[in-house]
Every structure is written in C-alpha cells, then in structure tokens.
Design a protein with these regions (language model features):
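N-terminal pre-domain/capping segments
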Residues: 1-72, 76, 254-272
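Active-site acidic/histidine proton-transfer and metal-coordination neighborhood
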Residues: 51-139, 148
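Generic structural signal for well-ordered alpha-helices
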Residues: 13-18, 38-42, 64-69, 94-101, ...
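A short, acidic, amphipathic alpha-helical segment used as a generic capping/interface helix at domain edges
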Residues: 162, 196-220
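Aromatic-rich peripheral "rim/lid" segments of glycoside hydrolase catalytic domains that contact
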Residues: 229-272
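Active-site clefts of carbohydrate-active enzymes
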Residues: 179-189, 219-238
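Acidic/histidine-rich catalytic cores of soluble enzymes
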Residues: 106-191
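Hydrophobic faces of well-ordered beta-strands that scaffold small-molecule active sites
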Residues: 1-3, 28-30, 50-56, 79-81, ...
Length: 272
C-alpha cells in the first residue's frame, strides 16, 4: 500500500490496516523479516478476526529459521517464501529447496515458494524444471511475470496456456495483478485492457478449480491483491499513476469473490 507520491505523505500503518479491514478484505500479507512490524500488524489482524501470510525473502537456508520461529509465536496461515537467490544451474537450486522444505516440515508450517521477479523462480521454463525435480513443490503463483518474461504472442495459444496451467496445478496461493505481454501491471478498469483481464480471470479460475480438487475441505486459499507502486504502476509525464491502485485492488477483490462464489455454486450443483 505504498503511495510514493511526491506531493502526498504515505498512509500511516494504522490507516492502512483500517482501510484493509473496512474494505472487507479477509486478511493481508505481512513482512515477517521485521519482528516488531509483524507483531503490530498481526495483533491488529487477529483482533479483527482476519488472517495473514508471513512473507520472507531468504538468501540462505538458515534465513528461514527466525521466520519460522516468529510464525510459531505469532501464527500465520502459511509462509510465502520468495527465494532470493538466482542460481544459474538447476542443480544449485536443489540444496536451497531441500533445506527450506526440511525446516518447514520440522516446524510443521506450510511454506509456499512464490514465482517472482528477480528470484530463483523468475523464469517460466526454469521453474518448470524445478517442478520436474520437486513435483510436490507448493507455489504461490504470480504469473504476471511469466506473461511478460516470455512475451506470449496474442492471443495466448494452447501450448502456452498449458505451461501456465502446470504452474497453477502446483499453486496453493495466488498473488494477483493483471499484466499485458509487455507491461507487468496494468489497470483492470481501462477498456483497452479487458482482453488481458479476461486472460487472467481465466487463469485464476483454473487455479481455483485446481486447488479445490487438491485441497482438504477446511483448507484456505489465499488470493493477495498485489498491486505495486511505480515503477510497477504505469505513470504519466507528470509522474502520477494512471489509475488509483487502491480502487483497482477493491475491484479485483470483488471480481475474485464473485468468481469464487460462482465456482462454489457450480461445484455444488454438480455434486447434487
């Protein structure tokens, strides 16, 4: 919820949390690399019956240990791990993933590895090779980076859909932003973006349906509306963003809730 406006102050943390609560979000992503910050935010969320994911960015296997210790104290639905390493060879990734998975198992905490820019998972094909090595690897899917990174031809063909679907079939959480094949974040409200909105809604529907087939009856699927400030957000010549990201996030929340409700209703009719 950073604003990064030259002529306006950032919203205070208390204001941000109240906005999230009052807008009807179920929870938030919380940086667990700062214990004091995490304690303050999770105290608010817990007090209002909300949930959270613990976000971290380890550069070593042992970097995950204090995060898991903090989760043991503060709780979390799961740890969202951005693998902040960039090995050139697949074999160099294996010790990191094996180590993080071992620590997660020992702690009894679910850890999801995020597909993210400038991380181990930044490249689509490289990530698919990781899934070859770890078929049960739990991902948090932000597929905006893959659309831009591969610059898929438009309309996206079935072969490229299949590559994205494979990532989504390993995903236990979603980070949501709408991209085009050339911009990693675009407003879902602009008329010229509706083809891209439909593309991502289709991918997210696939992800939700895939997750519902795999998850237990009491499991929770988190969808984080993750709309970043500039340079993620596109700006005009005056440096101002072309859309209101907070309003875009509210629109995305409602779109996903509507999608979820439709899927649940369709599954219920099919089971009747």
């Amino acid at each position: 919820m950073e604003r990064r406006l030259a002529n306006e102050a950032e919203w205070p943390l208390a204001t941000q949390l109240a906005m999230i609560r009052d807008a009807g979000f179920d929870g938030a992503g919380v940086r667990f690399i700062d214990p004091a910050f995490a304690a303050e935010v999770t105290s608010f969320l817990r007090g209002h019956g909300m949930i959270w994911q613990a976000q971290c960015y380890p550069t070593t296997v042992d970097d995950l240990k204090p995060v898991l210790e903090l989760v043991a104290r503060l709780g979390a639905d799961h740890v969202n791990l951005q693998p902040n390493v960039r090995p050139y060879r697949l074999q160099e990734c294996i010790p990191y993933l094996e180590g993080w998975r071992r620590l997660a198992d020992e702690a009894g905490v679910a850890v999801h590895v995020e597909t993210h820019r400038d991380r181990m998972t930044t490249d689509l094909f490289f990530t698919l090779h990781l899934l070859d090595c770890f078929p049960d690897l739990r991902l948090t899917a932000d597929v905006s980076h893959y659309l831009v990174g591969r610059e898929f031809a438009w309309p996206v063909d079935e072969a490229n859909h299949a590559l994205i679907h494979r990532v989504l079939d390993n995903s236990w959480g979603i980070h949501g932003r709408v991209a085009s094949r050339e911009q990693v974040q675009i407003s879902p409200g602009f008329p010229q973006h509706q083809g891209w909105v439909a593309l991502f809604m289709g991918w997210w529907e696939y992800a939700i349906r895939s997750w519902r087939r795999r998850a237990g009856p009491d499991a929770i699927l988190t969808f984080l509306c993750e709309l970043g400030p500039p340079p993620y957000a596109i700006t005009g010549p005056d440096g101002a963003e072309l859309s209101d990201r907070w309003q875009d996030a509210l629109v995305m929340k409602d779109m996903i809730r509507t999608l979820w409700d439709r899927i649940v209703a369709e599954d219920a009719r099919s089971a009747a």
